Regions:
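Extreme N-terminal leader/targeting segments of oxidoreductases
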Residues: 2-74
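Conserved N-terminal/central alpha/beta ligand/cofactor-binding core
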Residues: 11-14, 40-57, 62-64, 103-222, ...
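Core beta-strand elements of the Rossmann-like FAD/NAD(P) dinucleotide-binding domain
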Residues: 71-73, 250-260
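Conserved redox-cofactor binding core of oxidoreductases
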Residues: 156-252, 272-273, 323, 332-336, ...
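Glycine-rich loop(s) and the adjacent beta-strand/alpha-helix scaffold that form part
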Residues: 256-327, 542-545, 549-558
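A glycine-rich dinucleotide-binding beta-alpha-beta segment and adjacent secondary-structure elements
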Residues: 454-539, 620-626
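Active-site- and interface-proximal helix/loop "cap" or "latch" segments in soluble metabolic
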Residues: 588-678
Length: 678
């Protein structure tokens, strides 16, 4: 077709496509200029005077002859992630005729923490959110640049969202752990409101999105995997559907959606071009990937081609957990495939959030470390290399218990005595956390030399003085979050930010309808999750744990229920039968001896896999994940391979949360190898 799958998913395909003179043409499809020539049709050239920024490009021209199929439905959901699967589940319960497009071969990774306000779980725990304070605090985070009417939807409807999901998850054996912890209030320090809203389902298996997939399949629905959004179709001010491309065959499909299109495609965190243009602080301070690399901002771009507006300021969600080796700077590096990636091999090092002493490359303390997750990272963007060093001693376990941080940083506290053995020591062995019997030796291991080493040792001594005084006269950190550096061995590590997602996206109103720059509704177009903006500016309020996901799930449910109230037919069920799925788990029990090879689709192309079988047993599996994200698929693949060998096949082997696309590709390739051996 002239466009590789990898280039297409990067978003570069649009630049090779012609441009419609008057925007998107209804009832047409995207093809490359070279294909148009081969078919004897002329594709327009890109407009030389385009006013669109380079990251956005122009809307593709649409040629009817490129369409292989036309699908008709009432509701089109684009994206099978957290929001998309929630919308699909609610729609399936009501018998709505809908389809779900998903560019990958599996549903998106499940985020397990969601925020819901004054839910039944909260009431059972005796917790109540001060809604007026919550609303005021949320607005303060954005300097008033949010739409409080949109915020109110999450505040007012998230309890119902929880009550909808809870029976589904409980029936699968999952248990909700409602967090009702409070931070200690102190004088002379910013009082952050941390509302009791976090609902954590404390078993990752089965994952919620997989559970919802199975739920809709039981009702006769299915997900159109391996179909990537190309653009939306539009008549006047009304969105009529979308064009998608089958990323395996290259074929184009037009989907006509009579009642609406829901954009649930996530943010643009996996698109370095958009990040560098829209969120320039990210390359200044981020070192780690904790996002789905296939989230390229395509839903945002497609909506903007259809006339939508997006938030004016960035809102990257960055946690202070991007563990790197000494000497590594923040920002992108280019991997062996020529792609921009972040350098850390670790997705998130959770203890990075703990308020221990932090110094820059000059060995100098530069802030009060008792802050929300992104504050140290943002401050480090102004320091050398965009990174900083965290230091603590062997009292780390008791210190963490006293600090009593909230949100997902509490995972470190919950480890108790296992913290050193299970989390810190493995990174010592990996060479990322340094350990020494003296602070001077630690300084050497961390790369401090000359004046910087002198500063580091002086800063450690000063920090001990502040601990003894129980008064941080230098930066004002609360006394209960001071710690001493006196009990060897000592630990030190370098940190940058770990990017989770972007929260700046399409303008929406309180019904999740997408808006134009003139604040007019684009008919039939809706957005949820990180494709829906209007709530976050500059950062994410990390002390509102689970707000991002809770908002996503609530908005998705709201859209479907709104359309039903407006008259979208119910009780119809799916209009198209589900295709036969060839993904059954297999065992090597009756297989012939030999070494077999196959390829599975990963995030960044094919994953070569080989399986060696002897006497009906899998004795060795290799999976080349060098093209996958190191901190995601690169970490998950070794364990998955071990599980496959132990299970003698793929029966009962689960994907690893956070790396489902890579894992699914390996599992499918192993199945293909087993089939060859039967």
């Amino acid at each position: 077709m002239g466009i590789s799958r990898r280039d297409f998913l990067r978003g570069t395909a649009a630049s090779a496509l012609g441009i419609a003179a008057a925007g998107l043409v209804p009832g047409a499809a995207v093809i490359s200029a070279s294909v148009a020539a081969a078919e004897g049709e002329k594709a327009a050239a890109p407009a030389a005077d385009s006013k669109n920024p380079a990251w956005l490009g122009e809307a593709p021209v649409i040629l009817e002859s490129s369409i292989s199929e036309v699908w008709k439905t009432d509701l089109l959901i684009i994206g099978a992630g957290n929001g998309g699967m929630m919308a699909a589940s609610v729609a399936a319960d009501n018998g709505v005729d809908f389809r779900v497009l998903e560019q990958n071969s599996v549903v998106g990774d499940t985020r397990h923490w969601y925020g819901a306000i004054n839910s039944s779980a909260a009431k059972a725990a005796g917790a109540e959110v001060d809604i007026s304070l919550l609303r005021s605090e949320a607005s303060r985070y954005t300097s008033g640049k949010m739409d409080q009417r949109v915020l109110n939807v999450w505040i007012n409807e998230s309890a119902a969202m929880h009550d909808y999901l809870a029976p589904i998850l409980e029936a699968a054996g999952l248990v909700c752990d409602f967090a009702n912890d409070k931070e200690q209030e102190v004088e002379h320090h910013t009082r952050y409101y941390c509302p009791p809203q976090q609902h954590f389902w404390n078993d990752y298996n089965p994952q919620r999105n997989v559970l919802l997939k199975e739920r809709i399949e039981a009702k006769g629905y299915y997900i159109d995997f391996n179909h990537s959004l190309v653009c939306l179709t539009k008549e006047g001010n009304k969105v009529t559907g979308a064009i998608a491309q089958n990323v395996l065959t290259g074929a184009y499909v037009r989907v006509e959606a009579a009642w609406g299109v829901l954009i649930a495609t996530g943010g643009y965190e996996g698109n370095p071009e958009m990040i560098e243009a829209l969120a320039p602080i990210v390359p200044k301070c981020v070192t780690a990937c904790s996002f789905n690399p296939s989230n390229k901002g395509m839903g945002i771009k497609a909506a903007m081609w259809a006339g939508a507006e997006r938030d004016l300021e960035a809102a990257p969600m960055i946690f202070d957990r991007g563990l790197v080796a000494p000497g590594v700077n923040a920002g992108y590096v280019v991997n062996e495939n020529g792609e921009k990636v972040f350098p850390s091999p670790v997705r998130q090092f959770n203890p990075g959030t703990q308020p221990f002493l932090k110094v820059d490359r000059d060995g100098v303390r530069f802030m009060d470390e008792s802050q929300p997750y992104n504050d140290a990272v943002h401050a480090a963007a102004r320091r050398k290399g965009g990174v900083y060093c965290q230091v603590f001693d062997s009292n780390v376990v008791s210190d963490v218990q006293r600090f009593f941080t909230l949100g997902c940083s509490a995972i470190t506290r919950m480890q108790g005595d296992a913290l050193i053995e299970k989390t810190i020591e493995p990174q010592v062995e990996a060479g990322l956390v340094k350990k020494a019997d003296t602070l001077e030796e630690l300084a050497d291991l961390l790369g401090f030399t000359g004046k910087a080493k002198e500063n580091f040792l002086a800063t450690c001594a000063r920090y001990n003085e502040l601990y003894d005084m129980q008064d941080d006269v230098d930066f004002g950190k609360p006394a209960y979050r001071l710690s001493e550096l006196r009990k060897p061995p000592y630990y030190g590590l370098w940190l940058g930010g770990s990017l989770l997602c972007t929260g700046d996206a399409l303008w929406i109103n309180e019904d999740m309808q997408v808006l134009t720059p003139e604040r007019e509704v684009i008919e039939n177009l809706y957005a949820t999750g990180n494709a829906a903006g209007t709530t976050f500016v500059d950062n994410y309020p990390e002390l509102f744990p689970g707000m991002c996901l809770g908002r996503n799930l609530t908005f998705a449910k709201h859209v479907v229920e709104k359309l039903i109230r407006d008259g979208m037919p119910t009780g119809k069920g799916p209009s198209m039968a589900a295709p036969v799925q060839d993904n059954e788990a297999l065992t090597a029990e009756n297989c012939k001896d030999g070494t077999y090879t196959a390829k599975g689709r990963g995030i960044n192309g094919d994953i070569p896999v080989s399986v060696e079988i002897k006497g009906g047993k899998i004795v060795h599996v290799t999976a080349d994940v060098s093209a996958e994200t190191p901190s995601l698929g690169g970490v998950a693949a070794p364990k998955l391979v071990e599980d496959i060998v132990a299970a003698n096949g793929t029966v009962g082997v689960d994907t690893v949360s956070g790396s489902t696309i890579t894992c699914e590709g390996i599992l499918r390739a192993v199945n293909d190898c087993i089939k060859q051996a039967l």
